[in-house]
């Protein structure tokens, strides 16, 4: 697994605003979108391209185009949805699939409750979106799911990660025979006894969309 912790002043600035308890949901959503677009620039560095010819107003010239099959963006529900627009802003021709993964608050293990993905992902580059890499279970379970369907290159984008989550995720994917890249905007200190990232930014889903009773 290849880890990239982003080092950019705008990333740090937006992450600081996201952490603030005083940032309301509408502003939080906008900041997430902006931050993910910055992350997507780095995350798509290895997106597959092929030569093509384009005609300018003056002449024909060589260029590149994204290869087929198209990249697949996979937000993990529900918080991952908040990252989708920022990703699609940079790569609008990508297709989108969904995985519903929730954490059992007693065992801290991931549970899949929904999925909407192509049955065959052979030859697909997949971009998995999950704001918080805490225990690593949800992200690792999603990556394993995609690999079983044939995905051969996976990049995961997370806004925050805990060291424990990165280590657990590394263990979960180390035996997978596909390249796996992890892009994080910030690396925090640790997990608390409830499995939450500290200092963190709170529950990303609740801060994006409010608390669903």
Curated annotation (Swiss-Prot):
Catalyzes the conversion of uracil and 5-phospho-alpha-D-ribose 1-diphosphate (PRPP) to UMP and diphosphate. Keywords: Allosteric enzyme, Glycosyltransferase, GTP-binding, Magnesium, Nucleotide-binding, Transferase. Allosterically activated by GTP. GO terms for biological process: UMP salvage; uracil salvage. The lineage of its organism: Bacteria, Bacillati, Actinomycetota, Actinomycetes, Propionibacteriales. Belongs to the UPRTase family. It comes from Cutibacterium acnes (strain DSM 16379 / KPA171202). 5-phospho-alpha-D-ribose 1-diphosphate binds at residues 78, 103, 130-138, 203. The keyword Calcium does not apply. Its cofactor is Mg(2+). Its EC number is 2.4.2.9. GO terms for molecular function: GTP binding; magnesium ion binding; uracil phosphoribosyltransferase activity. InterPro entries: PRibTrfase_dom, PRTase-like, Upp_B, UPRTase/APRTase, Ura_phspho_trans. This is Uracil phosphoribosyltransferase.
